[in-house]
């Protein structure tokens, strides 16, 4: 047999090393030893999808027409449901035919949108720390990522004055990625902040891509805004959303993009050439979810708030600095100065059998922080709290 050299493309070489490979290796070693691990590392809801959504899926799956190729843009029924939900939840009016696009999960849309608007060598502003897909999608499109720091002193909001200095000598900046409520920092943003974003984007002629996947996971009666609520936002931007976190449907892969119709159309052109749309039965079930989101979402928030109020004091008791978040199901905990994130996480796995995520996995500015999730039952989090209270590291 001829030996072939299967050399991957240069774009793959540009992707950062997979930090979590070492953590996964340690996890597997512990499991092979017979040790049980408590995982607070992955933001994947442990709660079940609501029954009324599953019932709609079952009915939809029995319709033979739903097993044919779906529309590239998505079912109009689902897009109308998205528009109604945005009107009801945020007071934002959308045209379901031109301002709503169905996605195979919001991650797919985020991963593809640079292909629609970024030419090789052009720049994209990505938050640091931030969801790694923003950075990876830019590189895979041949773009140049410009990380901008999210610092605790600024409540993990960007400093637009500093960003302006960063981009003075850069190639054309095409996209600004934002994400509030934020993963991994759990920070929230106000409508006043989004007004500032609109002003900055219009000044520099930049497309704003806001990731709003955690808008419905909020606490203490503090609903989170949509970027599109800001005056003029739809002129320069779009918003990614998903049913994954809101309805415990991460495996179903249904999301949506809303906003400026030219931005929507650009991503739709990419999708037309790359995928064949989301399964219609899943879109029907997602329609049911959006049409009957309450009281399900209220109860979901109650559960996560109970979990938050168990875990945060336990983290603080170990010597970690950790604010109680207004939204998301993440705790973003700061280690003492000079203590590496990876070292802490590996030690936590080996000695306490608890899995968390090192902050530097989300970017350079994440070093010195650790992310924990609330995606475990209250009884498990109470067990974690007891373990942590007996183990004061600092």
Language model features with spans:
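Conserved PLP-anchoring active-site segment centered on the Schiff-base-forming lysine
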Residues: 116-138
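Active-site phosphate-binding strand-loop segment of PLP-dependent enzymes
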Residues: 146, 150-221
């Amino acid at each position: 047999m001829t030996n072939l050299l299967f050399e991957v493309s240069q774009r793959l070489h540009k992707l950062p090393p997979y930090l979590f490979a070492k953590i996964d290796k340690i996890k597997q070693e512990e499991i092979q030893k017979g040790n049980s691990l408590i995982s607070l590392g992955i933001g994947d809801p442990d709660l079940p999808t609501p029954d009324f959504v599953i019932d709609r899926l079952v009915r939809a799956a029995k319709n033979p027409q739903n097993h044919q190729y779906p529309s590239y843009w998505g079912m109009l029924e689902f897009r109308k449901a998205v528009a109604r939900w945005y009107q009801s939840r945020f007071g934002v009016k959308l045209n379901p035919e031109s301002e709503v696009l169905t996605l195979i999960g919001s991650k797919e849309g985020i991963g593809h949108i640079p292909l629609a608007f970024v030419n090789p060598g052009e720049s994209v502003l990505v938050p640091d720390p931030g969801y790694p897909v923003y950075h990876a999608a830019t590189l895979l499109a041949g773009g140049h990522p410009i990380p901008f720091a999210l610092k605790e002193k600024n409540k993990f909001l960007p400093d637009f004055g500093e960003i302006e200095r960063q981009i003075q000598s850069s190639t054309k900046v095409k996209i600004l990625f934002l994400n509030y409520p934020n993963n991994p920092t759990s920070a929230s943003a106000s409508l006043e902040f989004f007004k500032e974003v609109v002003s900055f984007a219009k000044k520099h002629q930049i497309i704003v891509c806001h990731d709003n996947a955690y808008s419905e996971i909020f606490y203490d009666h503090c609903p989170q805004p949509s970027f599109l609520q800001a005056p003029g936002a739809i002129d320069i931007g779009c918003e990614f959303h998903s049913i994954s976190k809101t309805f415990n449907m991460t495996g179903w892969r249904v999301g949506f993009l809303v906003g400026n119709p030219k931005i929507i159309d650009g991503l739709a052109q990419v999708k037309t050439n790359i995928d064949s749309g989301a399964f219609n039965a899943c879109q029907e079930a997602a329609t049911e979810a959006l049409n009957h989101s309450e009281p399900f979402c209220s109860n979901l928030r109650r559960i996560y708030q109970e979990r938050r109020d168990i875990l945060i004091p336990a983290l603080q008791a170990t010597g970690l600095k950790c604010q109680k978040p207004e939204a998301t199901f993440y705790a973003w905990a700061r280690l003492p100065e000079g203590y590496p994130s990876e070292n802490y996480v590996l030690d936590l796995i080996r000695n306490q059998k608890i899995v968390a995520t090192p902050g530097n996995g989300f970017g350079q500015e994440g070093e010195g922080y650790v992310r924990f999730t609330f995606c475990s039952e209250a009884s498990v989090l109470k067990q974690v709290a007891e373990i942590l209270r007996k183990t004061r590291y600092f």
